[in-house]
């Protein structure tokens, strides 16, 4: 089949820079909205999740820096998706803890069961997304590979921060304050 060009345009580097700037602003606005939402929805636990989320983003940028990756618009999209998945992991855990508070014997047990019962869902979702990132990296080129690298690093850091960082913050807080009841 013959290929017919309907239109051809040449764009300058300013358009790419403008797109990156717009993407960065969108990320900042979305990030702030997520931080506010988590605190309003989950109180102190939302604060713990936010600290873990900030650590998560820092780890992603650190890993990208180590491998010498350039942040592109698809890379920003990968970070945004990663933030969503990191928040989702904490929401799954916190909702599970809320459920366990109704039946568990005390808040410590509710926290423990919440993490235990949410773990498989979090791991499954992140493994399938990581496999997708690996496939995109190996089969894709250019922007698709950049998206896949950012997403892959993000999945690794998200699992770490959701399972270990947030949980550690909650355990440290709980062991120091020993509350009789908790609100999630």
Show which residues each predicted segment covers.
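Short helix-coil transition sites and intra-membrane helix breaks within transmembrane domains
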Residues: 26, 47-49, 85-90, 123-126
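Hydrophobic alpha-helical transmembrane segments of membrane transport and translocation systems
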Residues: 62, 99-184
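Interfacial segments of transmembrane alpha-helices in multi-pass membrane proteins
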Residues: 17-72, 138-142
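Hydrophobic alpha-helical membrane-associated segments
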Residues: 33-39, 85-89, 157, 161
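Extended, hydrophilic extramembrane loops/domains of integral membrane proteins
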Residues: 1-7
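Membrane-embedded alpha-helices of multi-pass transport/permease systems
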Residues: 87-90, 94-97, 167
